[in-house]
């Protein structure tokens, strides 16, 4: 492609030269169009490839091929799987599927707690060499002390905590935000406080521990305000 705008991250010149030298162009076709931009591969830090356990929804093969088609060369997979990657043994099942089925780079998250049940910390130390971070995605960690200990261990291991924030006692069977749509059409709503209260708690723990933290989902203006003020 010629005349396109090239968007690039910083790259060591020696690496760039090596890549250029390795490209064979015996029958090169030139596509000339200044309307387009050329980017390096994208990375999606929150995907669900659903293997092991839920291959009827997605697989490493289908998920990675769809990612590559869309320009994503690296993704980070969430741990709400069966079995949950909460131990070296369970994580290895996922790593084997990644090795056999993925056409892109896949970096899994390990679970924060065993079975994502919020009762016992998972084997963070054992999984650390092969995960990008720790998350109980799909469920909020309800115990303040459990989340504090998770942050401290993650900090010692150099791995980020990635949180799905919900206070279970405030869900009350809801499955959609308790806003105008829910009130007009009848779905049972979830109050904004369910999300915001746990984000506020976690941000206080972040201040106490000084560690890296990411919220998976932000769905209310109240949550945005809490984060903005932190």
Describe every region a protein language model picked out.
Residues 1-41:
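Histidine-rich, glycine-flanked metal-binding segment
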Residues 96-112:
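A glycine-rich helix N-cap at a beta->alpha junction
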Residues 56-64, 115-126, 201-202:
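Short, acidic/polar
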Residues 45-58, 79-81, 107-119, 185-193:
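Active-site mouth loops of central-metabolism enzymes
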Residues 36-101:
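Metal-associated gating/positioning segment near the N- to mid-region
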Residues 121-230:
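Histidine/acidic residue-rich metal-binding segments in metalloenzymes
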Residues 25-27, 34, 72-73, 101-105, ...:
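Short coil/turn connectors at secondary-structure junctions
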Residues 4, 35, 46, 67, ...:
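Divalent metal-coordination and catalytic microenvironments
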């Amino acid at each position: 492609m010629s005349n396109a705008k090239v968007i690039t991250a910083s790259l060591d010149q020696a690496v760039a030269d090596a890549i250029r030298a390795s490209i064979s162009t015996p029958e090169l076709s030139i596509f000339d169009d200044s309307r387009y931009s050329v980017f390096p591969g994208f990375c999606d830090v929150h995907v669900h490839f659903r293997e092991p356990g839920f291959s009827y929804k997605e697989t490493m093969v289908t998920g990675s091929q769809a990612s590559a088609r869309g320009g994503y060369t690296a993704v980070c997979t969430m741990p709400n799987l069966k079995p949950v990657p909460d131990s070296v043994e369970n994580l290895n099942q996922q790593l084997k599927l990644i090795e056999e089925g993925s056409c892109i780079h896949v970096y899994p998250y390990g679970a924060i707690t065993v079975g994502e049940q919020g009762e016992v910390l998972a084997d963070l130390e054992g999984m650390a060499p092969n995960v990008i971070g720790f998350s109980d995605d799909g469920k909020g960690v309800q115990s303040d002390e459990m989340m504090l200990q998770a942050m401290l261990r993650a900090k010692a291991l150099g791995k980020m905590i990635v949180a799905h924030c919900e206070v279970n006692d405030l869900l009350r069977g809801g499955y959609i935000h308790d806003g105008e749509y829910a009130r007009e059409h009848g779905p049972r709503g979830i109050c904004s406080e369910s999300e915001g209260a746990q984000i506020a708690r976690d941000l206080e723990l972040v201040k106490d521990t000084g560690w890296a933290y990411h919220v998976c989902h932000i769905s209310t203006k109240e949550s945005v305000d809490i984060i903005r003020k932190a």
